[in-house]
Structure formats: structure tokens, C-alpha cells
Amino acid sequence: MAAPMVRCGMLLARRLDASRLCLAGKRCLLSAAYVDSHQWEAREKEEYHLADLASLMDKAYERKLPVSSLSISRFVDNIASREDLDSAEYYLYKFRHSPNCWYLRDWTIHSWIRQCLKYGAQDKALYTLVNKVQYGIFPDNFTFNLLMDYFIKKGNYKDALSVVFEIMMQEAFDVPSTQFLSLYVLYRCLAEKTELTWEEERDFGASLLLSGLKQRNTVGLSSQLYGYALLGKVELQRGVRAVYHGMPLMWTPGYLDRALQVMERVASSPEDLKLGREVLDVLDGVLKVVTSPDVQTSEAQPQEGEDGLGSANLVEQLDTEEPEQSKLPRYLERFQASRSKLQELNRVESESLLTLTTQLVKEKLPACEAEDLATYEQKLREWHLERVQLIQREQEQREKAKQEYQALSAAEKAA
């Protein structure tokens, strides 16, 4: 009875921590300058009627001819209503399944997401992002940030989390601002969840791990530990294939061992590094779960409909899981020793990870915004030059085709 009450108290504290971030005004995470669209809207763009572009693309597809990346770009740029988005979605799908699919421009993807947000179709933006293979929507970090921040400010953390999972799948945690936003969303969502499915444990684990790898601070190191702990639990209960299959993760067993290595590195580091008490409790709970007799006897039972695990995967499980199971007693000893050492060195942070992440976002995000905006402005200039070159090439090809046609017509008349 005491455990659920403690859990409820932790959840309440986390929710209060989350609310502090939005108390002062409307600004939650990204500033108004970051999400402002005036610079984007003021760019030089070509005016076209969507009906003309649609007719042009339809004729090209009917005749099995390639559709230019400029055509789909012009269509997306000239969207003027919510209804136009439906047509644009159709042509994005068609373009993705055409021979020219590799040439969908980055600025077209950026424009598509902005148009969806502009006309209240954030659900369509998320749908095409999640179904990226069908639509070719692979945004850059700035675009990811805009979409994440939009959902955060709407209080829609479920969809914000879906964006984070897509960032994880695309391995796009290269920019600090994306790391901070993602970590905030992850801990905000974990604050609301009392239980996770094994698929959620895998997705949360991978996202926490990859977003925390480049942060050498309490939040980053705790996120690495949290991620390894959740992935280690999945590995022990479902097999290492369930961890790496379809995920940007290593297929080498030993995720719990890697979690313990994080603890040991922090404990032996000359720097004043700390780990969150919360994540140590998580790893403690994982170790207790995977060492319980019920779990160990149920692990060997194949799960019905689980990715069609065949005899080859069964051999893999027998080869990899048994050694990990035999290491669990040593893992427990290492965990207890490292935790004691961390406590002796005063390297255990009592604040919740959501509170720590919120503080980190407030402290670091403004400087990250300045870097992102400078990069974005440079990217706008590069996109403009690339577009100008494509338009020039298009005009040259049209002129060449016109001359060839005229020469052919003249030859036919002469004959």
C-alpha cells in the first residue's frame, strides 16, 4: 500500500515541476522569435495556381514521365487553405513513389510542416512524419523543434512524444536544442505514466539514451542510465532482438552492464558529476524485476505473434540471454557497491529528473536558440541559391527541348 502512495506523491511532485515552466507568460520553451514565420513567409517564391500544377503533374504521371522536385515544391508553397493540404498530401505520396523520390528538397519538407501548422493540420504533419517511408518526410532539427514546440504549447504531450520517437528513429539528436526539448518531453510524459508496455520501455529507453549521450551533466548521464536500464529490462525479458530490431541500437547484449558502467564512471570521475536518485531507483527496480523467479521462468516462453521469431531467433536467445542471466547476481553486487560509493561522495541528486531537465532547459535553451536561428538563416540563403539554380536548369532544359522540337518540325517539313 505504501509503494503506490509514494508513486502517487512522486507523480504529483513532477506535475508541479512541469507547471513551473509555463507560469511566466505564454512562453513555454521556444521563444516567439524562434517560431516566428515572417522570415519564412517573406522569402522569394513563385506564384502558381494549384489546379495548373496538379494538371501538369497528373499528365506527367499518366505518361510515365518524371515529375520535377520543383513542381511538388511549388505546390506545397502555394497552399492557401486546409483543403489544399489534402491535395498536397496526395502529391507528396505520389512523388515519394516515383523515380524522382530521392530529390524531395529539404525546403519542401520544411514548408510542408509549416503549412500544416499554419492551417491547423498538425495531425496531418504528424501522420506524414510517422509514415515517412510513404511520404518522404525527413525533417531537419529546426523543423522537428517547431513541431515539438507546437504540441508542447498545446499541452499535447502524446503527439510531442511521437515526434521525439521519430527523432530517435531518424537518429537526429545532433543539435543541443533538439536534445533539450526531447528530454523535457520524455520526462514530462514519464511523469504521467504509472506503467509502460515493453514497446514503450524500448522506445523511451532508446530515446533517453540517444538524447542523453551528448550531455555531460546530471540530466544527460541520468538519461543514459535510464535508457540502458529500460533497454536492459527488455533484453532480459524479451531477448536482445526485441531491443535492436527496427531500432537504431546495438545488437550486442549487455544493456544492464552498460547501465552499471555509467554509474561506475560517475563514481570514479574527477569531475563533480551526479546521477538522479530517481534513475537509481529505476535501475534498482529493474534489477529486482529481472531477478525474480517468475520472470526468469517466463522469459523462455515465446510470445505469440512477436515479429515471427523463428528457430534462428530462438538459438540467438539461448546464446545471449543465458549468459546475461548468469551475470545478474554480479550486476546486483556492482549496483549496490556503486550506489553506496555515489552516496558517500554526495553524487546522488535528490531533485526529480523533470525538475532538473526544466532547469537545464531554462539555462541552456536561449543560447541554443541563437545558434539555431543563425544556422536557419544560413540555410534559407542556401535553399534560395539551390532553388535559383534548379529554376535556371529547368529553363535551359525547356529551351533546349523547344529548339529540338523546332528542328524536328523543320526537318519534317523539308522532307
Curated annotation (Swiss-Prot):
Gene Ontology MF, one: rRNA binding
UniProt similarity note: Belongs to the mitochondrion-specific ribosomal protein mS27 family.
Disulfide bonds: none
Organism expressing this protein natively: Mus musculus (Mouse)
Gene transcribed to yield this protein: Mrps27
Assembly and interaction partners: Component of the mitochondrial ribosome small subunit (28S) which comprises a 12S rRNA and about 30 distinct proteins. Interacts with NOA1. Interacts with MIEF1 upstream open reading frame protein. Interacts with METTL17.
Protein name: Small ribosomal subunit protein mS27
Keywords: Coiled coil, Cytoplasm, Mitochondrion, Repeat, Ribonucleoprotein, Ribosomal protein, RNA-binding, rRNA-binding, Transit peptide, Translation regulation, tRNA-binding
Residues of the transit peptide: 1-17
UniProt keyword annotation of Iron-sulfur present: no
A Pfam family it matches: MRP-S27
Annotated Gene Ontology cellular component terms: mitochondrial inner membrane; mitochondrial small ribosomal subunit; mitochondrion; nucleolus
Positions of transmembrane segments: none
Function: RNA-binding component of the mitochondrial small ribosomal subunit (mt-SSU) that plays a role in mitochondrial protein synthesis. Stimulates mitochondrial mRNA translation of subunit components of the mitochondrial electron transport chain. Binds to the mitochondrial 12S rRNA (12S mt-rRNA) and tRNA(Glu). Overexpressed in hepatocellular carcinoma tissues compared with adjacent non-tumoral liver tissues.
Coiled-coil blocks: 369-415
